[in-house]
C-alpha cells in the first residue's frame, strides 16, 4: 500500500450554490498519526466517489425536501478506498484493507435499528445529507462497522455498490420473481442499475422507459434483451399503458419499478401494471403529487416506496464479485478531485451523455 502523502481536500457547496475544492478534515498529519480517530473508527483514503443526482441537487437547489444546505457542506456518499489508519480497539479491519463505505451512521438503539431496518433510524447520520459532511475528500474517518471489505474489487466497482444497494433494496422489497414481466421507468443511473438487477433476477420481458433517446440507446447496449420506450409527454397515462402492453407482446407488467419520482411517470406506471400488480417507487420526487386513486383501488394495485437501503451491501458485493451483475459500463467519465467543478458540470449536463461520473484520487503508482 502507498502511504498517504497528499493534503486532504474536499468538494464543497453552500447556500449560494457555489461549488469549490478546499482543505478538509482530517488533516494529512492527523491521518498519518491517527490522532483524530474515535473508538471504533478507521481512516479511509477515498479513491473513487460517484456523483449522485442528489449531490447535483444539493448544489443546484440547496435542498431535498427538509434536508437543507445551511453552511459550507461537503458532498458525496458513493465511495470506496483503502484503510490507512485504525483505532486501537478496531479488530475487523487493518491498514491496507480495500473497503466500500456504507455512508450511514446509526444509533443502534431505536426500533428501526433493533428490528433490522436501520435505514429508518431516528438519529441516522447519512453522509452528504446536510448537515452531515460527505465523502468527497481524500481522507475520511468512518465507523469500521460500515466499511465493507471488497477484496481485490476495483475502487470504481466499490463506489458503485451504493447505487447498487439502492436498486437491490427496491428489487428485493418489490419481490421480483423469475419470469415476472417488469417495467423500469427511467434510464438514469438508478434505473440502469435496477435494470441489471431485474435481469439477474430472471425477469422477462423487461421494458425500460425514458424521455431521452440517448439513454435508451445506452440501456439497449447495456442490456441487449431489454425493450425500450421513449416517453411522449403528449400521451395520456392510458396511451402509455397501451404502448407498454403492446411492446410487451400483450402482457401487462406485473411490477413497475419507478426510478424517476416524476408524477406523470408514476401515474403511467399505475395505469399500466396488471390487476393485482405493484408499482414500487425507488425515485425521489416532489413533496406532494397527485395519484390516480380509483385506478389503484379498482385494480388492486399496490403502491410501495423505499428509503435508502438496509442490509444490502454484503449481497451487493457478492453479486459484483461473482460476476452476476456487471456495472462497469456505467462509469462514463472520470475526473481528478482537483477537477471536481468540471466533473459536476459534466454530471449535471444531459448533453454530455454522462451516466455515472466518478471523482478519483490516487497516489502515484497506486493500484486502482
Swiss-Prot record:
Transmembrane segments: none annotated. It is an enzyme of class 1 (oxidoreductase). Zn(2+) 2 binds at residues 107, 110, 113, 121. It comes from Aureobasidium melanogenum. Its cofactor is Zn(2+). Liamocins have high bioactivity against the pathogenic bacteria Streptococcus spp. and can be potential new specific inhibitors of oral streptococcal biofilms without affecting normal oral microflora. Liamocins are also able to inhibit human cancer cell lines such as breast cancer cell lines T47D and SK-BR3 or the cervical cancer cell line HeLa. Its EC number is 1.1.1.12. Disruption phenotype: Affects the ability to produce liamocins with an arabinol headgroup. Induction: Expression is regulated by the cAMP-PKA and HOG1 signaling pathways via the transcriptional activator MSN2. Pfam families: ADH_N, ADH_zinc_N. Belongs to the zinc-containing alcohol dehydrogenase family. This is L-arabinitol 4-dehydrogenase.
